[in-house]
């Protein structure tokens, strides 16, 4: 029986879909299953998910990936979880059911509330949490649920509510309600966590009026939290599997890219675009609009990172496809962009839900600048792809300033990293080498690596490094003066979108 091959199963719960992946010891993806779930937009700027639908979708993907691969649950050494961060779920402890839809990280309903704090409070929050007061983070979302759902405050007072980000919700469900935990990376994105003590902070809880009794216990990213409930995989199947990692999706990609040394950078192009640089055990405070975040943790050690968050990246391509209908699918954008020699000085600023790092303007809105009678569909498509690279470059530039050293190399992943036009433009505009690994599932691999390390599937980080293979490397093809001219136009365009909503009301 000892010769039976073992695997790691990863649950990758994203913003638009729930995925399940099976990985072997060599870092190969054996099977993948993906199911999309519904996006709800009840009002302008509001974004919600049905947490029950997320659970059902994730469970279905988990069962289907095992069926598809022919791998028995007994061959799974451990389950790792990675998730969309900040999205907040509050549920009733007695029924196990959410009292309101999950409020998604993109949601802007608390933007006005976030404007009400004085300078000293803003500085206190940044000093303690590493973050800024912004609708993006979970804390203000939880406050909104407690303040607006009938009887929620009373239920919280009676100890009948539980709050978690999606990882906590999934672990709670996977264990049949036995385990209520989170990890350092997800806890830190709530605005309620102190990066110096690595625990919930009473002053922050008081500021946002959130009772401590609704919060989960904080654990490391790599340890056994509990076991799946009997019957999870099929009726009558009593197999219970260790749940051995929990890590926010962007931190998971950093670990999956094996950016384990100080100064190493990864850029993930998903719905948004997220750039992290490892700062080791040092907490680096940003003076250039970035966030200080937990990178990952083990039982005895916490590592930190600087992060820049771009709200709209791949979502801008979805907008071209679904709203403007000028492309049939995302893959076509590379072809369209290559049909014109330049962007004809057209700039697209896709700040549909405001601007993230380094600007942090919740009231900016999207715009297209530089249109004339000669502008064609190809120019707009090209400018939209370029906008993704410009936004990432704004963050990479800020990172170089905070780290007091220019970023010369970064590793890329996410769906849009397959777009060669975008990757070459990114290399050009950032004047950096861009490296893409063969296995683009770096987010899932980070959680898999963490789970595998927790149960001894992999002995150490050196073993993990053997699994990393490079697909391509790109170097800049434009000179610095050419790039400076392009960036100047981008800066002008971005600045003209600032405070748009405020100024027209």
From Swiss-Prot:
ATP binds at residues 15-17, 271, 314, 318, 415. GO terms for molecular function: ATP binding; glycerol kinase activity. It is an enzyme of class 2 (transferase). ADP binds at residues 15, 19, 271, 314, 415, 419. Keywords: ATP-binding, Glycerol metabolism, Kinase, Nucleotide-binding, Transferase. CDD domains: FGGY_EcGK_like. One of its GO terms (biological process) is glycerol catabolic process. Pathway: Polyol metabolism; glycerol degradation via glycerol kinase pathway; sn-glycerol 3-phosphate from glycerol: step 1/1. Its EC number is 2.7.1.30. GO terms for cellular component: cytosol. It holds the Pfam family FGGY_C. It comes from the Bacteria. InterPro entries: ATPase_NBD, Carb_kinase_FGGY, Carb_kinase_FGGY_CS, FGGY_C, FGGY_N, Glycerol_kin. The keyword Nucleotide-binding applies. Glycerol binds at residues 85-86, 136, 249-250. It catalyses: glycerol + ATP = sn-glycerol 3-phosphate + ADP + H(+). Sn-glycerol 3-phosphate binds at residues 15, 85-86, 136, 249. Inhibited by fructose 1,6-bisphosphate (FBP). Belongs to the FGGY kinase family. Key enzyme in the regulation of glycerol uptake and metabolism. Catalyzes the phosphorylation of glycerol to yield sn-glycerol 3-phosphate. This is Glycerol kinase. It comes from Mycoplasma capricolum subsp. capricolum (strain California kid / ATCC 27343 / NCTC 10154).
């Amino acid at each position: 029986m000892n010769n039976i091959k073992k695997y790691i199963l990863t649950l990758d719960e994203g913003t638009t879909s729930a995925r399940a992946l099976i990985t072997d010891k060599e870092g190969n993806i054996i099977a993948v299953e993906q199911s999309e779930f519904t996006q709800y937009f009840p009002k302008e700027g509001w974004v919600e998910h049905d947490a029950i639908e997320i659970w059902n979708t994730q469970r279905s993907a988990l069962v289907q990936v095992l069926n598809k691969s022919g791998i028995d649950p007994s061959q799974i050494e451990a389950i790792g979880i990675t998730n969309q961060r900040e999205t907040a779920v509050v549920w009733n402890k007695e029924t196990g059911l959410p009292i309101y839809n999950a409020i998604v990280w993109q949601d802007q309903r608390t933007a006005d509330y976030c404007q009400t704090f004085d300078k000293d409070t803003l500085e206190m929050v940044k000093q303690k949490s590493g973050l800024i007061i912004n609708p993006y983070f979970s804390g203000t979302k939880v406050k909104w649920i407690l303040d607006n759902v009938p009887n929620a405050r009373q239920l919280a007072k009676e100890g009948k509510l539980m709050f978690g980000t999606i990882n906590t919700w999934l672990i709670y469900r996977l264990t049949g309600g036995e385990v209520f935990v989170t990890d350092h990376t997800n806890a830190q994105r709530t605005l309620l966590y102190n990066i110096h003590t690595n625990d919930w902070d009473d002053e922050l809880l008081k500021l946002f009026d959130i009772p401590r009794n609704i919060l989960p216990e904080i654990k490391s990213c790599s340890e056994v939290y509990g076991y799946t409930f009997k019957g999870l995989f099929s009726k009558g199947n009593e197999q219970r599997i260790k749940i051995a990692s929990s890590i926010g999706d962007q931190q998971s990609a950093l670990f999956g890219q094996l950016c384990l040394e100080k100064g190493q950078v990864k850029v993930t192009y998903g719905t948004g675009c997220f750039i992290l640089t490892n700062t080791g055990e040092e907490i680096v405070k940003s003076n250039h609009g970035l966030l200080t975040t937990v990178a990952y943790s083990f039982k005895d050690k916490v590592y930190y990172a600087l992060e820049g968050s771009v709200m709209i990246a791949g979502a801008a391509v979805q907008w071209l496809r679904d709203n403007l209908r000028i492309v049939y699918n995302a893959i076509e954008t590379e072809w369209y962009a290559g049909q014109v020699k330049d962007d004809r000085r057209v700039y697209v600023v896709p700040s549909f839900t405001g601007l993230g790092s380094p600007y942090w303007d919740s009231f900016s809105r999207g715009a297209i600048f530089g249109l004339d009678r000669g502008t064609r569909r190809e120019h707009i498509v090209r400018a939209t792809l370029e906008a993704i690279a410009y936004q990432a470059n704004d963050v990479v530039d800020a990172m170089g300033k905070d780290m007091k050293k220019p970023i010369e190399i970064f590793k890329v992943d996410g769906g849009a990293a397959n777009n060669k036009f975008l990757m070459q433009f990114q290399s050009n505009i950032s004047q950096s080498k861009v490296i893409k690994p063969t296995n683009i599932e770096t987010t899932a691999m980070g959680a898999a690596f963490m789970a595998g390390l927790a149960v001894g599937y992999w002995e150490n980080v050196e073993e993990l490094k053997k699994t990393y293979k490079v697909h391509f490397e790109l170097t800049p093809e434009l000179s610095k003066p050419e790039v400076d001219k392009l960036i100047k136009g981008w800066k002008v365009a971005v600045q003209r979108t600032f405070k748009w909503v405020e100024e027209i009301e």
